[in-house]
Swiss-Prot record:
NCBIfam families: trpA. InterPro entries: Aldolase_TIM (IPR013785), RibuloseP-bd_barrel (IPR011060), Trp_synthase_alpha_AS (IPR018204), Trp_synthase_suA (IPR002028). One of its GO terms (molecular function) is tryptophan synthase activity. It comes from Novosphingobium aromaticivorans (strain ATCC 700278 / DSM 12444 / CCUG 56034 / CIP 105152 / NBRC 16084 / F199). The keyword Heme does not apply. It is an enzyme of class 4 (lyase). Signal peptide: none annotated. The alpha subunit is responsible for the aldol cleavage of indoleglycerol phosphate to indole and glyceraldehyde 3-phosphate. One of its GO terms (cellular component) is cytosol. HAMAP family: Trp_synth_alpha. Belongs to the TrpA family. It catalyses: (1S,2R)-1-C-(indol-3-yl)glycerol 3-phosphate + L-serine = D-glyceraldehyde 3-phosphate + L-tryptophan + H2O. This is Tryptophan synthase alpha chain.
Length: 266
């Protein structure tokens, strides 16, 4: 089993947490990632800062600007990832970002760097499966999971293309919009997850708009994992280099809610 498959094979839903690499500075990210693990996160998503994060809401857009303003480069993100892997050999780490930093030096180079840094998976926000002749094959060839996105507009005709070649988990974006701005109705999430699970052979994690333990617990009742990003990024914005404590506190509350959600209905 891989680190990612192990994270979803614990007999309970998984908590997936996101922060932007290099926010507020490359050096400060290490302690924030450690806080996520100490708080109980099962999977870590590390954002690759980009100048035009079109799928992200204000919180993560500002995180990208802070990171880039601190001088964060792609090499810094891989350094952060490699150091994380050395400290946490069993915790899955996923890079999330946009195509430009991933393909500028070639998909094969990017995939090789992922392997060297101990990265388990990659989420590329702006390359749909129909337009991915290079990055997906390069990652799969290197043994790195390619984690695709499904949305409320992913219908039965398109879902097979999204699932083909996907591994690790499927990320269901519960709202058609940008990150962190709103949460979808619980009924629509339940319907979508049930529909996707009829075809998917990998876990389904749900994100976008999840900010509180109560929201996370509701989703965890039906999904294999819950993704939380903007709420954690907001804490980094508020506390800067001192964010590790507040991040750990919120992560612990989220983890407790997600991990116990199924017990309430058992």
């Amino acid at each position: 089993m891989t680190r990612l498959s192990n994270a979803f094979a614990k007999g309970r839903p998984a908590l997936v947490t996101f922060v932007t690499g290099g926010d507020p500075t490359p050096g400060a990210t290490d302690a924030i990632l450690d806080a996520l693990v100490e708080g109980g996160a099962d999977v870590i998503e590390l954002g690759m800062p980009f100048t035009d994060p079109m799928a992200d809401g204000p919180a993560i857009q500002l995180a990208n600007l802070r990171s880039l303003g601190a001088g964060t480069k792609t090499a810094d993100v891989f350094r952060i990832a490699a150091d994380f892997r050395a400290r946490h050999p069993e915790v899955p780490l996923v890079l999330m970002g946009y195509a430009n930093p991933m393909v500028t030096r070639g998909p094969d180079w990017f995939a090789a760097e992922c392997v060297k840094a101990g990265v388990d998976g990659v989420i590329c926000v702006d390359i749909p499966p129909e337009e991915d002749p290079e990055l997906g094959p390069a990652l799969r060839g290197a043994g790195v999971s390619l984690i695709r996105l499904a949305t409320p507009t992913t219908d039965a005709a398109r879902l097979p293309a999204v699932l083909e070649g996907s591994s690790g988990f499927l990320y269901y974006v519960s709202v058609a919009g940008i990150t962190g701005m709103q949460q979808a109705a619980q009924a629509s999430i339940e319907e979508a997850v049930a529909r996707i699970k009829q075809s998917a052979t990998i876990p389904v994690a749900v994100g976008f708009g999840v900010r509180t333990p109560e929201q996370a617990a509701a989703i965890a009742k039906v999904a294999d994992g819950v993704v939380v990003g903007s709420a954690l990024v907001d804490l980094v914005a508020r506390h800067g280099a001192d964010a590790a404590g507040p991040v750990k506190e919120l992560t612990a509350a989220l983890a407790a809610a997600v991990h116990s959600a199924r017990k309430e209905i058992a």
